[in-house]
């Protein structure tokens, strides 16, 4: 699989990434979906574009929890377009929760790195190669996106906790095993456990774009949930 | 030990030290200036912590980056994606 094409991308980063990642590195993106019929094709297209432009070996695992809006149909069309070696459909009958979605997805993942992100375009897949680069740079076990450092930021005020992270597969398996909370609190708990287990964590500044900016999303509910989650973690870890 | 337990322990130790010193239970004769500072210390520390927290949050909110470029870029890429996918046979 010698890569002698030099004209595909003017960026030296592409060759840099190819040289540094070994032939065996493969990145599995886990995309749990629920009613993402409109967003799913877009995020898959952007992911494919980012990975192809950087010459990264990847697969995208779509875990749909019986979405009533036909997300699964769209996923099947994407599988036909991009191939079943790149788009893996592993749906479930009904909404069974995020944690179990990740476990289910990981069982079918053939990559040695797992990327977890939301399917609703809250994070742009263009950052994924940066995550990969950062991970190689510091040999990190986990790389997390942050809106608060560097040139990270937001467009639109959505307080929902959106998380995008890259994990070594065995690290994610270990952490999921140890975590006990439910919902998005468990994503927070994963970082707490990771620190307890002395895993190394890197950060990449990312931008979050709220596509439906203009609709008010500031809800006290979200703040309350976050504080409750924080207190729960404080008292249990 | 959970973080909560650690904090409770720490507060218990500091609290009992402060109480012992301010009530003279240890029989120590502290100079008056020390006693004057020691007595309101917990309240003072609490208020300072609150001010620091509010100040930090305020500063961070004020300096939060606004990504207009990212929003524009995303919108144009969405157009591109829809066109390309439609060409490849995706029925939206």
Curated annotation (Swiss-Prot), chain B:
Transmembrane segments annotated in the record for this chain: 8-28, 37-57
One MF term in the entry's GO annotations: enzyme activator activity
Subcellular location: Endoplasmic reticulum membrane
Pathway assignment: Protein modification; protein glycosylation
One GO BP: dolichol metabolic process
A matching Pfam family: DPM3
Cross-referenced PANTHER family: DOLICHOL-PHOSPHATE MANNOSYLTRANSFERASE SUBUNIT 3
Family: Belongs to the DPM3 family.
Name listed for the protein in its UniProt record: Dolichol-phosphate mannosyltransferase subunit 3
Organism: Pongo abelii (Sumatran orangutan)
Designated gene of the protein: DPM3
